[in-house]
Swiss-Prot record:
GO molecular function: small ribosomal subunit rRNA binding; structural constituent of ribosome
Record carries keyword ATP-binding: no
Residues that span the membrane, as ranges: none
Quaternary structure and interacting proteins, as annotated: Part of the 30S ribosomal subunit. Forms a tight heterodimer with protein bS6.
Swiss-Prot/TrEMBL keywords: Ribonucleoprotein, Ribosomal protein, RNA-binding, rRNA-binding
GO BP term (any one): translation
Designated name of the protein: Small ribosomal subunit protein bS18
Species per Swiss-Prot/TrEMBL record: Actinobacillus succinogenes (strain ATCC 55618 / DSM 22257 / CCUG 43843 / 130Z)
Amino acid sequence: MARYFRRRKFCRFTAENVVEIDYKDIATLKNYITESGKIVPSRITGTRAKYQRQLARAIKRARYLALLPYTDNHQ
C-alpha cells in the first residue's frame, strides 16, 4: 500500500515577514488566482487568515484598476 506524503503548507507572507500585500505586485497576485480568475482559498494555499484577507483585498483592487482580469479569456 503506497503512502502519499503531502507537502506541508506554509504561509509565504509570514515566512518573508511581509507587512502589507501590495495590489501593484501582479506577479505575486497571479499565484493566488485560478485560470478562470477566482481567488484560491487559504486551505489550498496555506496562507494565514490575516494575509488571506489582505490578498483578497489586493486582488479586488487590482481587478478594479484593470491590472488583473475578472475572468479568463473567453474564446
